[in-house]
């Protein structure tokens, strides 16, 4: 009997997983690996419940397809399970939905054992695979595929959907219509290791599912929304991700739940009122005075909502939702020992977890001797793909009345850029470096 998503079953996951392959659908087997001891993934998120590296073998009347592999340390588990369902000379197709190392760790050895196999992946994944295989790349039948292309296994066909930036540029999905299985790689995944493998058997993994989405997919939510539109017409009965439980019970509910996770963020982006957030750290109140002046100038625009935040002694994480929903941010920092202050760098580091591409960015601050902080912050904002329409504003020591007026004018110009009243302009690296 099927159950809704996240129905609470025994709280503790089972870490003693299957020793062999596991049937997912007729002719489809899980041949992945369990990693219950993992506690930190890609540096950016904690994994209290470990993770799984899900790989799949699909048997057709004319050969076998292998869809994704596992992290290199678990290649032995992968090959043992694969050998239980297929001979290497039967492997006709290797599909790489994503080239991150936790999905391609066994690829070089798999190709050595099955050199006759076709390798199919997205065109954007080709340079990554070339880097992985080095000189061996030319030895194999490797081609990029896009939406609408497919490879036949006889009575089963693997069809491909290009799904870029979910969450790397190379990501794609693979559709097995005969068994209604959609292989989504990282999409719909979760770092949750339970040897029972299926969502209707494992413990309650709601937190892991939502936390994974927040830390991995959230910066790419607009791309995820497009992919949901692309795959929604498919009559899938199973979603087979590359991490976490296989979603065989009510799989479409996970698509709906993912839409809910992103709907509020996308709705915030469509509002007519623009938002500007100003964050600052100040040693002797000089940068604080400049921040207030910028705030006052920007707030003169009736179409811009401006908020001012002193970061001293506060936590960065609570601001991330606000920043993601905002249209622009301005960061203020004094220059201390030739650099921006640590709190500002911590905020800049945290911004990699959210979508910042295309947002307005600006920097300002006071200094005593060298004044590099503003330039360094601007460079990082550009690295985050934000647009900088105005050169950063710096004042030496405490701002004068004239410099405070310059700050208000700076704020007015930022507001004009947000509302489209100013001519589009973007500061480039050469202009930053020259200051």
Swiss-Prot record:
Residues 276-415 form the Flavodoxin-like domain. Binds 1 FMN per monomer. Binds 2 iron ions per subunit. Changing residue 423 to A: In strain: ATCC 33303 / B10. Fe cation 1 binds at residues 98, 100, 167, 186. SUPFAM superfamilies: Flavoproteins, Metallo-hydrolase/oxidoreductase. Pfam families: Flavodoxin_1 (PF00258), ODP (PF19583). Its cofactor is FMN; Fe cation. Its EC number is 1.-.-.-. It comes from the Bacteria. Changing residue 285 to A: In strain: ATCC 33303 / B10. GO terms for molecular function: electron transfer activity; FMN binding; metal ion binding; oxidoreductase activity. Keywords: Electron transport, Flavoprotein, FMN, Iron, Metal-binding, Oxidoreductase, Transport. CDD domains: flavodiiron_proteins_MBL-fold (cd07709). Fe cation 2 binds at residues 102, 186, 243. Residues 48-228 are annotated as: Zinc metallo-hydrolase. It is an enzyme of class 1 (oxidoreductase). Low-potential electron donor to a number of redox enzymes. Homodimer. In the N-terminal section; belongs to the zinc metallo-hydrolase group 3 family. This is Type A flavoprotein fprA. It comes from Rhodobacter capsulatus (Rhodopseudomonas capsulata). The gene is fprA.
């Amino acid at each position: 009997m099927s159950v809704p998503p996240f129905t609470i079953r025994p709280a503790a996951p089972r870490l003693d997983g299957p020793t062999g392959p596991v049937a997912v659908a007729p002719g489809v087997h899980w041949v992945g690996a369990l990693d219950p001891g993992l506690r930190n993934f890609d540096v950016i998120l904690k994994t209290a419940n470990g993770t799984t590296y899900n790989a799949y073998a699909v048997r057709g009347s004319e050969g076998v397809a292998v869809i994704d592999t596992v992290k290199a340390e678990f290649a032995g588990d992968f090959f043992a399970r694969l050998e239980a369902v297929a001979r290497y000379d039967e492997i006709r197709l290797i599909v790489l939905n994503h080239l991150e190392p936790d999905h391609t760790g066994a690829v070089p050895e798999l190709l050595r054992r099955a050199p006759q196999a076709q390798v199919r992946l997205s065109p954007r994944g080709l340079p990554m695979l070339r880097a992985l295989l080095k000189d061996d790349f030319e030895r194999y039948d490797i081609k990029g595929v896009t939406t609408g292309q497919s490879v036949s296994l006889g009575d089963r066909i693997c069809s491909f959907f290009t799904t870029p930036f979910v969450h790397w540029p190379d990501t794609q999905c693979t559709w097995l219509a005969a068994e209604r299985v959609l292989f989504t790689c990282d999409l719909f995944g979760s770092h949750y290791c339970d040897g029972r493998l299926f969502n209707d058997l494992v413990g309650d993994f709601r937190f892991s599912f939502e936390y994974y989405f927040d830390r991995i997919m959230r910066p790419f939510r607009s791309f995820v929304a497009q992919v949901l539109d692309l795959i929604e017409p498919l009559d899938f009965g199973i979603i087979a991700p590359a991490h976490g439980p296989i979603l065989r019970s009510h799989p479409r509910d996970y698509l709906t739940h993912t839409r809910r996770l992103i709907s509020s963020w996308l709705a915030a982006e469509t509002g007519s009122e623009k938002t500007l957030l100003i964050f600052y750290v100040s040693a002797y109140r000089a940068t604080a005075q400049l921040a207030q002046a910028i705030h006052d100038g920007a707030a003169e625009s009736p179409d811009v909502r401006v908020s001012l935040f002193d970061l001293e002694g506060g936590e960065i994480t609570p601001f991330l939702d606000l920043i993601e929903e905002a249209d622009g941010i301005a960061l203020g920092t004094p220059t201390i020992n030739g650099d921006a202050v640590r709190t500002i760098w911590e905020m800049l580091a945290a911004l990699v977890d959210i979508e910042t591409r295309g947002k307005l960015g600006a920097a300002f601050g006071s200094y005593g001797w060298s004044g590099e902080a503003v330039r360094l912050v601007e460079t990082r904002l550009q690295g985050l793909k934000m647009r900088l329409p105005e050169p950063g504003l710096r004042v030496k020591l405490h701002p004068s009345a004239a410099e405070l007026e310059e700050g208000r004018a700076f704020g007015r110009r930022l507001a004009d850029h947000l509302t489209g009243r100013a001519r589009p302009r973007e500061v480039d690296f050469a202009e930053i470096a020259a200051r």
